[in-house]
Amino acid sequence: MAQTLAQTKQISQSHTFDVSQSHHKTPDDTNSHSVIYSTQNLDLWYGENHALQNINLDIYENQITAIIGPSGCGKSTYIKTLNRMVELVPTVKTAGKILYRDQDIFDQKYSKEQLRTNVGMVFQQPNPFPKSIYDNITYGPKIHGIKNKKVLDEIVEKSLRGAAIWDELKDRLHTNAYSLSGGQQQRVCIARCLAIEPEVILMDEPTSALDPISTLRVEELVQELKEKYTIIMVTHNMQQAARVSDKTAFFLNGYVNEYDDTDKIFSNPSNKKTEDYISGRFG
């Protein structure tokens, strides 16, 4: 299966870009992790609403980057540009570049479908399909042409193990996913995402609808997943960002107000507005 999906993930290398001049590198330039996403001078409009303004941000491989900020600041809009889901909004327009592995995802020759294979997404509300757990997990691989039952069985087990829920569900694979608890549904959605072997997982408030115990399980899972995946997570929960992330970007009014190592953001922020936000003075 890995070979089959790898074959589907070959993107043309004919349009590459030098990212060495990107003027907003991650705060720790000695970091051994490679840049996987480089956002350069990104502006985005919904009609006349200038939702993102001059965003410059580098995301590093195999790290968890938290995106924080008050409601309406552009957090969710930003991560939806990273897999071009934002283009589902008819009035949207963009300027600037987002480089994914040195290729501009807005280039006309860049495949949106391939991008969304490489970059999975988990939403705020658990959104399993109205199908069995098994069919939820195999949905993506089947779209990619995998039909062999043995291979699909292996994908299901591997994905559910990756989402730390195999032992809970291995005897219930043909149960409707809607019958699960909210926390279990969200982990099934994470497993469904893992089944297509992405490199990056975008998470938009993945625990906001969950109880504290389920939230803790998802947070523990996210920290395990960064060994194999790059995680970019929007959260309103300051404690969550501080607990799980390596880097934190604070968005305010469509701008990146501050971006730094999470420890520094929460212990010694450089910007007064960042300090005011994380201390609860506004937001």
UniProtKB/Swiss-Prot annotation:
Sequence positions that bind ATP: 69-76
Localization (cell): Cell membrane
GO molecular function, one term: ATP hydrolysis activity
SUPFAM superfamilies on file: P-loop containing nucleoside triphosphate hydrolases (SSF52540)
Biased composition (Polar residues): 1-20
EC class: translocase
Membrane topology qualifier: Peripheral membrane protein
CC terms in the record's Gene Ontology section: plasma membrane
Keyword NAD: no
Gene3D superfamilies according to UniProt: P-loop containing nucleotide triphosphate hydrolases (3.40.50.300)
Swiss-Prot/TrEMBL GO biological process terms: phosphate ion transmembrane transport
Enzyme Commission code: 7.3.2.1
Region (Disordered): 1-32
Domain ABC transporter residue range list: 37-278
Catalytic activity entry: phosphate(out) + ATP + H2O = ADP + 2 phosphate(in) + H(+)
Keyword set, alphabetical order: ATP-binding, Cell membrane, Membrane, Nucleotide-binding, Phosphate transport, Translocase, Transport
Subunit note: The complex is composed of two ATP-binding proteins (PstB), two transmembrane proteins (PstC and PstA) and a solute-binding protein (PstS).
Role description: Part of the ABC transporter complex PstSACB involved in phosphate import. Responsible for energy coupling to the transport system.
Family: Belongs to the ABC transporter superfamily. Phosphate importer (TC 3.A.1.7) family.
Protein name stated in the entry: Phosphate import ATP-binding protein PstB
Taxon lineage: Bacteria, Bacillati, Bacillota, Bacilli, Bacillales
Gene: pstB
